[in-house]
């Protein structure tokens, strides 16, 4: 199934969090928090401005982003757990 977000929404796959610290301590599942970092899977065409023109989004598929702790709505697409969020929920793009 192919999914295309509408408007200024982006589809994000969370980046898996490390299960072991740098010091070698294994973090149990009960102590883990969901990561606030992910990879953009798909983007919508953009939001409309006051004149009715579509303004393209600043993020694109493949970007690694940071987002707020409570951002987005969890969805399942092709068996994958993903998030749909507005571009305004994206805090920034992680550049390598």
Curated annotation (Swiss-Prot):
Keywords carried by this UniProt record: Chaperone, Cytoplasm
Keyword Chaperone among UniProt keywords: yes
Transmembrane segments: none
GO biological process: chaperone cofactor-dependent protein refolding
A GO CC term attached to the entry: cytoplasm
Keyword Cytoplasm listed: yes
InterPro entries assigned: Chaperonin_GroES (IPR020818), Chaperonin_GroES_sf (IPR037124), Chaprnonin_Cpn10_CS (IPR018369), GroES-like_sf (IPR011032)
Gene Ontology MF term list: ATP binding; metal ion binding; protein folding chaperone; protein-folding chaperone binding; unfolded protein binding
Regulation: induction: By heat shock.
Major subcellular location class: cytoplasm
Any Pfam family hit: Cpn10
Location(s), subcellular: Cytoplasm
Function per UniProt: Together with the chaperonin GroEL, plays an essential role in assisting protein folding. The GroEL-GroES system forms a nano-cage that allows encapsulation of the non-native substrate proteins and provides a physical environment optimized to promote and accelerate protein folding. GroES binds to the apical surface of the GroEL ring, thereby capping the opening of the GroEL channel.
Quaternary structure and partners: Heptamer of 7 subunits arranged in a ring. Interacts with the chaperonin GroEL.
Record-stated family: Belongs to the GroES chaperonin family.
Name of this protein: Co-chaperonin GroES
Organism name: Caulobacter vibrioides (strain NA1000 / CB15N)
